[in-house]
């Protein structure tokens, strides 16, 4: 564990040090390959054990009504271990496949970390999926467990299969309540089996733009290590407050709202808006001292409908990046004129981490 942590940190720190010297970073960087690497145990828990980082917010979610919920690294580490212990008690074992369909809520991050610790393979799913979509994913994904919000449990009523059903929120007849996880042992978690390295970590379904969605596999080593490139592209640093506009269930959410910021020991900020409100988002970004921002072109096109110049002195932004599709030069120029920051494009796929980007 100590060696895995040291290898990962050494590679991470090199990318932080050489962030502005691309040629040197290319020459010096060697992806770490620690044996049986389990990112949640060997990286996240070790980072959370540090007094300074442990007290830092790992996640902060701001709701539309202005209420917020923050979770420190130390609390997230402990709570995810508790959830892992509870998942074990209801039958989850290494290699099982769990379909995770939640919105931007704390339980999403807890569960994903818990599954990584256990070696349970996560199949992320967007809440936009229909019962027919879910039937297909559960069948082709060989799903053993489903964890979703109570409000979405009804989508599974007509979905056949012998799988554990866990509901987050109000009780649902026939479903196990996620709230029961608080009764599990809060300390002393030890994974029943070693999971890591080349073991499967995530199974994503592609978007299915031109054909039926296909399954894509990522391992415990390939995905977290791969997202060191995503961290480098975004320009994340320890202590940053990172805001990513993305929906859970898609790979971009794991990119920029999970692995990349936590690789950097940054705070993940989530702003839940039923309908996008550019002025409210800018106000929240100023209030929360957001330093790094990632969004699809659609968001940037709506942001430039605002007069950005007055925000220039109020925002703490250092980096702005876009992904999903190329940005129009006119949009990039308008943001630069208003905020003094050049939006940098990046490209990757469900099958990869960040592949190409303006650094």
Protein language model regions, located:
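Conserved pre-ATP/AMP-binding loop-to-beta segment of ANL
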Residues: 54-57, 173, 183-205, 212, ...
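Conserved AMP-binding/adenylate-forming core of the ANL superfamily
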Residues: 55-113, 130-135, 220-221
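ANL superfamily adenylate-forming
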Residues: 63-66, 145, 151-197
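Conserved AMP-binding A3 loop
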Residues: 69-74, 201-225
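Conserved structural elements of the adenylate-forming
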Residues: 77-85, 197, 216-237, 245, ...
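Conserved helix-loop-beta element of the AMP-binding
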Residues: 142-145, 160-173, 240-243, 269, ...
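Conserved AMP-binding/adenylation subdomain of ANL enzymes
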Residues: 224-241, 248-291, 306
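Gly/Ser/Thr-rich phosphate-binding loop
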Residues: 263, 290-294, 304-359
């Amino acid at each position: 564990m100590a060696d895995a942590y040291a290898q990962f940190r050494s590679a991470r720190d090199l990318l932080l040090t050489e962030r502005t010297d691309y040629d040197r970073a290319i020459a010096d960087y060697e992806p770490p390959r620690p044996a049986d690497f389990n990112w949640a145990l060997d990286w996240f828990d070790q980072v959370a054990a540090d007094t300074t980082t442990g007290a830092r917010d790992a996640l902060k979610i701001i709701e539309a009504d202005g209420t917020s919920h923050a979770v420190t690294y130390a609390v997230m580490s402990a709570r995810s271990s508790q959830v892992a212990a509870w998942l074990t008690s209801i039958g989850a074992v290494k290699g099982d496949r769990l379909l995770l369909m939640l919105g931007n809520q704390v339980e999403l991050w807890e569960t994903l970390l818990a599954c990584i610790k256990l070696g349970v393979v996560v199949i992320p799913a967007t809440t936009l999926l229909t019962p027919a979509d879910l039937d297909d994913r559960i069948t082709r994904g060989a799903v053993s467990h489903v964890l979703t919000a109570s409000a979405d449990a009804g989508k599974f009523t007509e979905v056949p299969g012998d799988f554990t059903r866990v509901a987050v929120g109000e009780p649902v007849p026939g479903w196990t309540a996620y709230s029961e996880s608080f009764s599990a042992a809060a300390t002393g978690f030890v994974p029943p089996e070693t999971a890591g390295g080349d073991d499967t970590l995530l199974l994503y379904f592609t978007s299915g733009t031109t054909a039926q969605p296909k399954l894509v596999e990522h391992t415990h080593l390939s995905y977290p290590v791969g997202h060191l490139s995503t961290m480098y592209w975004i320009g994340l640093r320890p202590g940053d407050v990172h805001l990513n506009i993305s929906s859970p269930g898609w790979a971009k959410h794991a990119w920029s709202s999970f692995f990349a910021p936590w690789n950097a020991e940054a705070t993940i900020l989530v702003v839940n808006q039923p309908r996008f409100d550019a002025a409210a988002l800018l106000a929240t970004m100023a209030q929360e001292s957001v330093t790094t921002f990632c969004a699809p072109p659609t968001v940037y096109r709506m942001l430039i409908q605002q007069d950005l110049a007055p925000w220039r002195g109020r925002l703490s932004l250092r980096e702005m990046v876009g992904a999903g599709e190329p940005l129009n030069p006119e949009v990039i120029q308008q943001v630069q004129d208003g905020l003094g920051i050049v939006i940098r494009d990046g490209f990757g796929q469900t099958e990869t981490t960040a592949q190409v980007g303006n650094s």
